């Protein structure tokens, strides 16, 4: 039941007693008793099967009536909000103030007080109490734990009715009972032993390095601190958003980066979870679906249309497993909150009413926003829908989206009685012009009951109908009620004691009472609660002769109809009987008669779907039994495709049995077992240029297609869904000029023509729809014509060109919020416009940034402006309108380059409002004609390449790295190579944190002074650019021969491995590493003192993320990783060949395969971007330069890849996988960025395939102590040859007190040391090189002292006299043993050996005997402070629970930034991890 109320929140005062009752003569009507209140009563709640009612009043006061509203009393000593337990109707909890609450288990007769340690939470998606479906004493409690202005979510629980309250989970996003509904588990044969104790919680970080939300569970209330993640298909379900309990089903919704499609998982036993498939209608996208009122054998879901600005949905019904949904009805009406016009008739199986938008297609296309609503009813569980009939006219009724009362909209437990407000005609009119209609045969026929709209209720099992005039909106008052004693045929009226407008009319939940409650308001703003009692109208109690055996469902012939194997009957009072049933609290129960089985009693079995004729057809080819189908013409006995619906009790004897096996032909069955061979399919295309794109799949993408599109030179578009085996040519009226994949939704692609016409597909190029822009796309060089919103996939910005001259136009920006159906002007004279708002970041959701030419003149300079209302009223001009060169959005950063005379400056913002000037390294002047290239920001620092030498073909520059908020840059790598297109030889190694490769120019002076050709060396970093080193060369080449230089354990200036980088790559999408083949890197290059020309290169591979290398092929080869690295394919580069080589053991051995009978030149080799497929495409050029031939090469037939690998989380190294840890080559342990990471890798010798993308990250063994590799040089410091950081001569450290100015809440700052911690590092303890000496911020001395408290007399003795006693010896010993230099801190080795090691933080200042004393004394409070920080670390939530009602964790990114871990990290440094959030930002030129 959906509970609604139009009542305004307010306070309530019991007024002085008015006359006790207003009584009519017994024969004239009901007895009415009135209580007056000066504020509107709210939240009326009946305890079921009692006359006890509680309502809310003034300042959360609660009032109680135990005589069906005849009298009221204050609930003494208790106040707050009442939360009824809907599964245990005698139970309710009062959420009280001051952490005191109350619970009752006997309908408010007695109450038990209890306390919860923290403040309870409601709103923002959280409810304070989650009740168990079967045990009233088991309750989950939602709270928030706050300290130091920061809060996090905490869940408590009780199993003994609040006698004890214990903590369950911290930092969760909500917890749920497995048995969240009384029906859950019924009929299931295999249930967990402790199902009643099983609790699920949404957990944001299953491991500290993987911040995607999981659903975890425990049968011991997490008392052992162990959480088991829910799986589907052997993989953790990630990106969990919410969970719900619906009858016998648990439903889980999940999302992932790269698609707007949501995944729905269903379980009937709280153990096994299966993904639900939706057929025949739109996919479930985002959170846009509503689980409707469902049955024990089926789930009803309304899926919102993605296209329409006006809310419209599609109704889906599941099979009995809850995993196969079929669309029953399109165009279902819903409101902006996704409340859906759908309601089942109470107590009768298979009948429900729904309102649909008859002009849905016009509304979706934007032709109109006015919905034409019509009502429909189904009598067969949604198979068919019919109009409602009032005589010979169609009837349309207002539904849930227009509530007028509380409780159900149309019906009640009164058998067959249905009422509604509406009108006859061709569409639904307004509520105010509607009349009141009634049906006494469950909606088959209708009659007009009363003129005008009324609130209505049912009593005495339907023998009494009560209605009151309902015009609250227009404040029209009435002094009478209407009632009917014969199912609405005739109506009588009764006078009310006051002229009022009705606010609420209700009665007992089971509609068996003769007493009703009316909440009303009069013209003087007085409020009344009226008890209306009809008990004395009929003196006679009904006898057997007064009842009929009423069939609940009728077929087309008017005969009792069958559903779920039986007919349904009710014992119901005859309409004209002059008696009352008077069986209070005895709800009518149905009688059933069994039916013989018919086709309707069966549903499609797994792997089968209904067709348009309601027949079950195979969704995929049927697998034959083993040993069958040796020949295509053979036949076998296979599944029929049907199964009896579980719970259906039809009689098979004498009826239909569709479950029997049927004969099937082998040619329609699945393919034969694997052949052991690699298969090849060849397709030629007439085109000179190769232009293709994969539509990548994400974690929650449905289906299994591998879709590729190819555009030819003449504008044709070809699509393959099987990775190049078969292709289809698109049918478009105009040639396609370019395609633009949606940046944030891989399922969506846009095709643009030279004019205004464009096409879009949201189903992975299966179907295309067209629209027109306001102007043809821009021709301005370097300007993209289409921009997308990261969270609203249908929001577009279109850049159209006007007055184009060559490749220069006056560009206008338009926006659409419905995928191009409607366009509105944003700005004229723009450079580019883009959405920069993103959920989980500090920017506003609808924030747009535009660069606009002065005076809208394209010859003028650009300025940066922004707006969060589409530039209708509010426009912010940044940098006082001064010229900018460009701007870019990278992860959470907005980076802007401004031009000030001859100097180029950079600014950074994380909220789109405040820009901080980027402080570049000292003495670093950037001329205005130089270029920035933003390289990467995936580790929450910006890598920026700044050109130092722009001479054509001689470009190079410096790679700078920012702090975590992008405002302070230090030099990471000088002389980094760049080309004339602003691409840089810099590449991050995927998955493994902080590893990157770069090429530097080793003769910069000669290049600058003499114009010499650039010479290169390759460098690698393992700590995110803090340190760079030469690549270690292999010991021998692939033939076992020595190299020309002397190879050592590490790369040297004379002998190292050098690899050709990004600037020489023919296809920018190719990469040296893979996002799924962890640790594998391939490149072409040479061993020597510098990089030789590409033509002289060989091919090399690393299996340990770049620490060691080996040569795999002589000569240059192209490569691709498949099946997450279990297949590696290489093919000769830029020379004719007909052979490829592949490795199944990470490059240890190679096998040649002839893919063509003639030699061709391979232009490119490709596979899906996630590298999870066993299919590849070789894009080849035969003799003709105007033809491309695509060779699909399929490795899935190999015997070595026949079975799927086995990975068990409880024993990850027991079967086909092992655990691998990346490490730093200069460290003895496997610590990288302050932690040990463990990754699942397939054993090279295992003969199996990986299949769906693995959760590669196994977990984190531990956080490590901080070492030199966890720090980099601070601003105005530079690295010395010995690895230390020293202040640049003539400069001062950055102002350490700036943090106090920037953050009014800051209590302290730290004196500069020359070092800053890498933002991505999670190390603890060890060398705290950036936080040595703390000082109080101005006016924060008191708070500082409280944070760093002093010590008492006894402690003071040891803190002063004992250190002084040993200071001389310690200081002298340290001085004599230490060989460091004054004025700098030397970074230590991997682990501190002792407190007096040469790298100890204690020895970090000029040392004298006295300094030894000072250091020891100072260390004590600092050590305490450090320990305290490691135990607090609360995270800041956005806004107030009580104010905004905002859910604190709206997205993965938001939760990544609020992990709830007790780690002392500055807020700006908190969002460090979460590879799932990385959107694959490519280099972006500013």
From Swiss-Prot:
One GO-annotated biological process of the protein: Golgi to endosome transport
Stretches that traverse the bilayer: 1350-1370, 1402-1422
Subcellular location as annotated: Golgi apparatus, trans-Golgi network membrane; Prevacuolar compartment membrane
InterPro entries: Sortilin_C (IPR031777), Sortilin_N (IPR031778), VPS10 (IPR006581), VPS10-sortilin (IPR050310), WD40/YVTN_repeat-like_dom_sf (IPR015943)
Cytoplasmic side: 1371-1401
Signal peptide range: 1-25
GO cellular component, as recorded: cytosol; Golgi apparatus; membrane
The keyword Disulfide bond appears for this protein: no
BNR repeat ranges, renumbered to this chain: 377-386, 437-447, 483-493, 718-728, 1100-1110, 1142-1151
Membrane topology: Multi-pass membrane protein
Entry-listed glycosylation sites: 296, 900, 965
Main location (coarse class): Golgi
Keywords: Glycoprotein, Golgi apparatus, Membrane, Protein transport, Receptor, Repeat, Signal, Transmembrane, Transmembrane helix, Transport
Keyword presence, RNA-binding: no
Residue numbers on the Lumenal membrane side: 26-1349, 1423-1486
Similarity annotation: Belongs to the VPS10-related sortilin family.
Function: Functions as a sorting receptor in the Golgi compartment required for the intracellular sorting and delivery of soluble vacuolar proteins, like carboxypeptidase Y (CPY) and proteinase A. Executes multiple rounds of sorting by cycling between the late Golgi and a prevacuolar endosome-like compartment.
Protein's UniProt name: Vacuolar protein sorting/targeting protein 10
Organism whose genome encodes this protein: Arthroderma benhamiae (strain ATCC MYA-4681 / CBS 112371)
């Amino acid at each position: 039941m959906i509970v609604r109320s139009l009542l305004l929140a307010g306070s309530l005062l019991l007024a002085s007693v008015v006359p006790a009752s207003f009584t009519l003569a017994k024969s004239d009507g009901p007895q009415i008793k009135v209580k007056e209140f000066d504020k509107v009563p709210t939240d009326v709640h009946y305890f079921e099967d009692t006359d006890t009612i509680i309502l809310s009043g003034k300042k959360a006061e609660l009032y109680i009536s135990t005589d069906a509203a005849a009298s009221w009393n204050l609930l003494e000593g208790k106040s707050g909000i009442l939360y009824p337990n809907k599964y245990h109707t005698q139970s309710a909890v009062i959420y009280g103030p001051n952490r005191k609450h109350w619970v009752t288990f006997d309908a408010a007769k007695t109450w038990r007080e209890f306390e919860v340690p923290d403040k309870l939470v409601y709103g923002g998606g959280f409810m304070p109490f989650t009740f168990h479906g079967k045990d009233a004493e088991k309750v989950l409690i939602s709270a928030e734990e706050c300290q130091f202005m920061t809060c996090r979510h905490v869940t408590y629980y009780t199993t003994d009715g609040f006698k004890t309250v214990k903590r369950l989970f911290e930092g969760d996003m909500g917890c749920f009972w497995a048995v969240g509904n009384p029906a859950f588990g019924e009929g299931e044969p295999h249930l967990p032993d402790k199902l009643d104790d099983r609790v699920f919680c949404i957990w944001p970080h299953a491991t500290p390095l993987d911040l995607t939300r999981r659903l975890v569970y425990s049968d011991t209330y997490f008392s052992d601190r162990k959480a088991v993640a829910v799986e589907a298909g052997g993989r953790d379900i990630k990106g969990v958003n919410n969970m719900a309990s619906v009858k016998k089903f648990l439903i889980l919704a999940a999302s992932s980066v790269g698609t707007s499609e949501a995944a729905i998982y269903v379980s009937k036993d709280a153990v096994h979870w299966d993904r639900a498939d939706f057929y025949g209608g739109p996919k479930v996208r985002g959170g846009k679906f509503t689980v409707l009122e469902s049955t024990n054998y089926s789930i009803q879901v309304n899926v919102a249309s993605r296209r329409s600005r006006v809310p419209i949905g599609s109704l889906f019904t599941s099979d009995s497993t809850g995993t196969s949904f079929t669309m029953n009805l399109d165009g279902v009406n819903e409101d902006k909150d996704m409340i859906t016009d759908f309601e089942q008739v109470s107590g009768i199986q298979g009948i429900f009413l729904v309102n649909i938008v008859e002009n849905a297609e016009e509304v979706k296309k934007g032709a109109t926003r006015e919905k034409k609503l019509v009502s429909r009813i189904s009598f067969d569980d949604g198979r068919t829908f019919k109009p409602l009939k009032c005589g010979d006219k169609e009837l349309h009724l207002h539904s849930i989206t227009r509530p007028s009362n509380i409780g159900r909209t149309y019906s009640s437990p009164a058998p067959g009685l249905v009422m509604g407000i509406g009108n006859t005609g061709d569409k639904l009119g307004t509520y105010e012009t509607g009349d009141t209609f009634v049906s006494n045969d469950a909606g088959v026929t209708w009659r007009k009951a009363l003129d005008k709209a009324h609130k209505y209720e049912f009593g005495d099992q339907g023998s009494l109908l009560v209605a009151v005039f309902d015009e609250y909106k227009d404040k029209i008052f009435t002094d009478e009620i209407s009632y009917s004693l014969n199912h609405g045929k005739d109506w009588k009226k009764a006078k009310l004691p006051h002229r009022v407008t009705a606010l609420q009319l209700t009665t007992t939940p089971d509609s068996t009472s003769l007493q009703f409650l009316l909440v009303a308001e009069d013209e003087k703003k007085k409020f009344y609660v009226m008890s209306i009692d009809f008990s004395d109208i009929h003196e006679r109690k009904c006898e057997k002769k007064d009842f009929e055996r009423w069939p609940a469902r009728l077929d087309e012939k008017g005969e009792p109809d069958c559903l779920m194997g039986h007919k349904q009957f009710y014992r119901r009072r005859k309409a004209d009987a002059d008696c009352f049933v008077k069986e209070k609290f005895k709800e009518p129960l149905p009688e059933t008669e069994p039916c013989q089985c018919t086709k309707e009693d069966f549903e499609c079995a797994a792997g089968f779907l209904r067709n348009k004729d309601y027949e079950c057809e195979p969704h995929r080819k049927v697998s034959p039994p083993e040993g069958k189908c040796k020949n295509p013409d053979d036949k076998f006995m296979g599944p029929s495709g049907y199964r009896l619906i579980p719970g259906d009790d039809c009689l098979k004897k004498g009826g239909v049995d569709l479950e029997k096996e049927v004969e099937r032909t082998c040619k329609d069955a699945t393919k034969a077992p694997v052949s052991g061979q690699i298969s090849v399919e060849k397709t030629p295309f007439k085109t000179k240029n190769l232009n293709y794109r994969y539509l990548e799949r994400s974690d929650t993408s449905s289906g299994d297609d591998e879709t590729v599109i190819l555009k030819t030179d003449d504008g044709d578009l070809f699509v393959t869904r099987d990775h190049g085996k078969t292709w289809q040519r698109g049918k478009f009226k105009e040639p396609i000029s370019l395609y633009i994949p949606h940046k944030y939704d891989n399922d969506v692609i846009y095709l643009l023509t030279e004019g205004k016409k464009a096409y879009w597909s949201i189903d992975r190029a299966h179907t295309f729809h067209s629209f027109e822009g306001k102007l043809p796309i821009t021709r301005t060089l370097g300007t993209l014509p289409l921009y997308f919103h990261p969270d609203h996939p249908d929001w577009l910005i279109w850049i159209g060109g006007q007055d184009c001259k060559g490749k220069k136009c006056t560009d206008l920006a338009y926006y659409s919020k419905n995928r191009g159906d409607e366009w509105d002007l944003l700005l004229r004279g723009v450079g580019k416009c883009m959405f920069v708002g993103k959920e989980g970041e500090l920017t506003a959701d609808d924030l747009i940034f535009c660069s606009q030419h002065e005076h809208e003149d394209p010859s003028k300079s650009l300025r940066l402006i922004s707006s969060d209302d589409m530039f209708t009223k509010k426009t912010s001009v940044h940098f006082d309108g001064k010229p900018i060169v460009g701007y870019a959005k990278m992860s959470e950063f907005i980076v802007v380059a401004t031009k000030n005379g001859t100097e180029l400056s950079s600014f950074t913002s994380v909220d789109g409002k405040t820009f901080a000037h980027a402080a570049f390294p000292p003495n670093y002047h950037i001329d205005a004609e130089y270029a920035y290239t933003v390289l990467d920001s995936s580790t929450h620092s910006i890598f920026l390449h700044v050109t130092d030498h722009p001479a054509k073909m001689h470009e190079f520059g410096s790679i700078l790295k920012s702090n975590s908020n992008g405002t302070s840059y230090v030099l990471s790598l000088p002389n980094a190579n760049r080309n004339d297109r602003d691409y840089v030889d810099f590449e991050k190694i995927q998955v493994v944190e902080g590893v990157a490769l770069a090429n530097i120019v080793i003769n910069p002076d000669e290049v600058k002074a003499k114009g010499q050709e650039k010479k290169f060396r390759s460098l690698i970093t393992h700590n995110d650019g803090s340190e760079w080193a030469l690549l270690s060369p292999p010991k021998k080449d692939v033939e076992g021969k020595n190299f020309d230089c002397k190879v050592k354990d590490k790369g040297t200036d004379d002998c190292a491995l050098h690899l050709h980088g990004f600037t020489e790559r023919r296809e920018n999408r190719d990469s040296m590493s893979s996002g799924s083949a962890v640790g594998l890197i391939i490149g072409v290059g040479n061993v020597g003192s510098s990089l030789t020309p590409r033509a002289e290169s060989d091919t090399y591979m690393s299996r340990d993320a770049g620490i060691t290398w080996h040569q795999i092929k002589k000569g240059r080869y192209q490569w691709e990783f498949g099946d997450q690295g279990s297949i590696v394919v290489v093919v000769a580069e830029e020379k004719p060949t007909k052979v490829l080589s592949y490795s199944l053991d990470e490059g240890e051995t190679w096998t040649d395969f002839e893919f063509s009978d003639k030699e061709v030149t391979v232009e490119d080799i490709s596979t899906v971007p996630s590298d999870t497929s066993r299919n590849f495409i070789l894009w080849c050029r035969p003799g003709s330069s105007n033809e491309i031939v695509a060779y699909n090469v399929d490795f899935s037939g190999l015997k070595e890849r026949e079975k799927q690998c086995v990975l068990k989380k409880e024993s990850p190294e027991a079967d086909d996988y092992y655990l691998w840890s990346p490490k730093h080559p200069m460290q003895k342990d496997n610590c990288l960025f302050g932690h040990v990471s463990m990754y699942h890798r397939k054993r090279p010798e295992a003969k199996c395939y990986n299949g769906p993308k693995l959760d590669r990250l196994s977990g984190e063994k531990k956080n490590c102590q901080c070492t030199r590799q966890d720090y980099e040089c601070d601003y105005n410091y530079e690295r010395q040859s010995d690895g230390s950081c020293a202040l640049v001569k003539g400069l001062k450290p950055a102002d350490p007190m700036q943090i106090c100015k920037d953050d009014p809440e800051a209590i302290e700052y730290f004196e500069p040391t020359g070092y800053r911690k890498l933002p991505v590092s999670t190390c603890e303890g060890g060398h705290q090189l950036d936080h040595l000496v703390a000082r109080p911020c101005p006016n924060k001395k008191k708070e500082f002292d409280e944070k760093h408290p002093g010590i008492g007399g006894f402690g003071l003795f040891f803190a002063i006299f004992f250190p002084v006693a040993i200071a001389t010896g310690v200081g002298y010993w340290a001085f004599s043993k230490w060989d460091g230099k004054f004025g700098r801190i030397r970074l230590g080795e991997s682990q501190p050996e002792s407190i007096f090691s040469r790298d100890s933080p204690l020895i970090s200042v000029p040392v004298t005997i006295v300094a030894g004393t000072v250091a020891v004394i100072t260390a004590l409070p600092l050590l305490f402070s450090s320990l305290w920080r490691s135990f607090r670390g609360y995270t800041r939530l956005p806004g107030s629970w009580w104010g905004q009602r905002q859910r604190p964790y709206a997205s993965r990114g938001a939760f990544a930034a609020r992990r709830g871990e007790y780690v002392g990290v500055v807020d700006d440094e908190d969002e460090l991890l979460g590879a799932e959030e990385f959107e694959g930002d490519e280099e972006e030129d500013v």
